[in-house]
Regions:
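Acidic, low-complexity, intrinsically disordered interaction modules
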Residues: 16-74
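Short terminal alpha-helical segments
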Residues: 2-23
Length: 74
């Protein structure tokens, strides 16, 4: 997972979001699939996170999308 210090707050917010929704199988499957996608650029990963969260968690903020995209990067 990315340790990019410029996005530490966003990553922490995304991590908290994942903890709060840890029983959601859709979210867990999405996270698992994204972890092993080595073919994605950051922009691709951000777009997929945005689409997933917009569809399943429309209340999720842009901070969560950005944090999740960085958190899932190696």
């Amino acid at each position: 997972m990315s340790k990019n210090p410029l996005y530490a707050n966003e990553i922490a917010t995304a991590h908290q979001f994942v903890i709060e929704h840890n029983t959601d199988i859709k979210l867990q499957n999405f996270l698992h699939d994204m972890r092993y996608r080595t073919d994605l650029t950051h922009s691709d990963r951000w777009s997929l996170c945005y689409d997933f969260l917009n569809e399943n968690y429309p209340e999720a903020s842009g901070t969560i999308v950005t944090g999740l995209a960085y958190w899932l990067e190696d």
